[in-house]
């Protein structure tokens, strides 16, 4: 068994879409990034890569590579999981937290779980997603950005 932990942060700006867990969230502000800036999926990818000591998403999908400009993070998540399975591991459980002052994310959590489970070909019961605020403290609390953390448990298949 292997455990991995991942964290990602992106700045909120006008003129960008807000995509979290592969789901488009209605919002006046979106996340700025080279890809679609999906902090939740990026944290999950980093956790997966970290579980096998394979570096981080910047190593595998550099932000100066035009192939990844505005790419859907679900595509990168699929590629990351294919890499993990090529090493003989599978995801047993994933737990994650999105930290955002607004918008309220509770109405979208189930859709995120289903979206991620579809990409990874897992059961939604293997995907935990929670949302919380920073109680108006720091960059998240002031609405400057959104942060996500993820922890994964991997099991060797063979």
UniProtKB/Swiss-Prot annotation:
Q: What InterPro entries has UniProt attached to this entry?
A: MECDP_synthase, MECDP_synthase_CS, MECDP_synthase_sf
The UniProt catalytic activity note for this protein reads: 4-CDP-2-C-methyl-D-erythritol 2-phosphate = 2-C-methyl-D-erythritol 2,4-cyclic diphosphate + CMP
Q: Which cofactor does it need?
A: a divalent metal cation
Q: What is its EC number?
A: 4.6.1.12
Residues of the site described as Transition state stabilizer: 34, 133
Q: Hey, which pathway is this one from?
A: Isoprenoid biosynthesis; isopentenyl diphosphate biosynthesis via DXP pathway; isopentenyl diphosphate from 1-deoxy-D-xylulose 5-phosphate: step 4/6
BP-aspect Gene Ontology terms:
isopentenyl diphosphate biosynthetic process, methylerythritol 4-phosphate pathway; terpenoid biosynthetic process
Question: What is a GO molecular function of this protein?
Answer: metal ion binding
Q: How is the cofactor bound?
A: Binds 1 divalent metal cation per subunit.
Positions of 4-CDP-2-C-methyl-D-erythritol 2-phosphate binding: 8-10, 34-35, 56-58, 61-65, 132-135, 139
Q: Which residues are a divalent metal cation-binding?
A: 8, 10, 42
Q: What does this protein do?
A: Involved in the biosynthesis of isopentenyl diphosphate (IPP) and dimethylallyl diphosphate (DMAPP), two major building blocks of isoprenoid compounds. Catalyzes the conversion of 4-diphosphocytidyl-2-C-methyl-D-erythritol 2-phosphate (CDP-ME2P) to 2-C-methyl-D-erythritol 2,4-cyclodiphosphate (ME-CPP) with a corresponding release of cytidine 5-monophosphate (CMP).
* Family in the record: Belongs to the IspF family.
- What's the protein called, per UniProt? 2-C-methyl-D-erythritol 2,4-cyclodiphosphate synthase
